[in-house]
UniProtKB/Swiss-Prot annotation:
Gene Ontology molecular function: rRNA binding; structural constituent of ribosome
Protein family according to the UniProt entry: Belongs to the universal ribosomal protein uS15 family.
UniProt-recorded name of the protein: Small ribosomal subunit protein uS15
GO BP: any one term: translation
rRNA-binding among keywords: yes
Subunit record text: Part of the 30S ribosomal subunit. Forms a bridge to the 50S subunit in the 70S ribosome, contacting the 23S rRNA.
Cross-referenced CDD domains: Ribosomal_S15p_S13e
GO CC annotations on file: cytosolic small ribosomal subunit
Signal sequence, start to end: none
Amino acid sequence: MALDAAVKQSIIKEYATGEGDTGSPEVQVAVLTQRIKDLTEHMKEHKHDYHTQRGLLAMVGRRKRMLSYLKKTDIARYRALIERLGLRR
C-alpha cells in the first residue's frame, strides 16, 4: 500500500529540515510511521495477509534502525521526533 502523493508531500513538508529535504532521518521516519499506521489498519481487517505482514515487519525494523541511528548521532533531534510522532519510547 503506497501513500497518496499529497499525504506524502504534506508529511515531507512538515518534517523537512530544509527546502527540498526528503532524506533526513526525521522525514524518513515520519513517512515510514504513516505507512506503518496504514498497514496496521489493513492488517486489522485482513488478518491472514501474510505478505503484507512481512512487509509491515520490515518497515518497523527499518524505522527502528533509523531511530537508533538518530539517537546515536543527535539525541535532541531524536527526542523531538519521538515527541512529535507520539511513538512510545
